[in-house]
Amino acid sequence: MMEIPEFTFHVVESADYEEVLHLFWDHFMPWEPATRLTGSCTKLGYRIYNLNSMLRKMLQNNTCWMAKSQHNEIVGVIFCTKITKDDMPSKLPTKSEYIHQGWPTDFTLVMLLLDELCDHQKLLCDNKVNLMLDLFALVVKTNFRGQGLATQLIKETIKNAQTMGVPLVSISCSSAFTQRCSIKLGFSENKTILYKNWHCDGQKIANVEDIDPIHQAAVSYYKVINL
């Protein structure tokens, strides 16, 4: 007798946009290590307008996938975005430019960290490809963690990238848990930034005593897909 899989995976449809955005803000942001270290607001119900709009655009581009339990409950989601060489700006925004765009001042530090962590233009050039899928955020509902769902979501996304003809995927992980999933699935390390060495404009961002001993660094990875 065939076993029924514990989770099923689906592209996020418009009817589920609000629920997966709720998952991101209430089951991811309050625990996201880099955001916490900047002192950026992570209280339940708080949303950063620009980031919410960015996630919504990813959803509208059909590059986000969700996991459902046997009871049809949405228990995880992975937000992704397709990146081409032509999409890349010639110069990444500075802190003041991010602020001018409407990003909260403290959260610009997280944006700058992500920019430093993964140079998508260089990654495309180094791997001699014109298209990649960036795994922007991986969310697992708090009461479903520790069941291997994060690894399954990344694995499913790699499979979907292959189906779409995308030759390269990247992921930037601020959490040690996602880093372990990436290594397990054969991703190659791209760049590591230890939180104790995280600086912006010559200023140290994180106090050593505030750094979680489990999550000590942000790491970016990439994986070449065999099409």
Model segments located where?
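A short helix-loop-beta-strand connector motif used in the catalytic cores of GNAT acetyltransferases and
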Residues: 5, 50-66, 76, 83-88, ...
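Conserved acetyl-CoA-binding loop-helix of GNAT-fold acetyltransferases
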Residues: 135-140, 145-159
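Helix-loop element at the rim of GNAT/NAT acetyltransferase active sites that forms part
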Residues: 22-41, 84-88
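Conserved acyl-donor/pantetheine-binding loop and adjacent beta-alpha core of acyl/acetyltransferases
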Residues: 35, 74-137, 191-214
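Conserved active-site alpha-helix within GNAT-family acetyltransferase domains
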Residues: 162-163, 175-199
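Conserved GNAT acetyl-CoA-binding A-motif
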Residues: 133, 161-174
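A short beta-loop-alpha structural element at the N-terminal edge
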Residues: 8-22
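Active-site rim helix/loop that mediates acceptor-substrate recognition in acyltransferases
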Residues: 34-64, 69, 79, 122-123
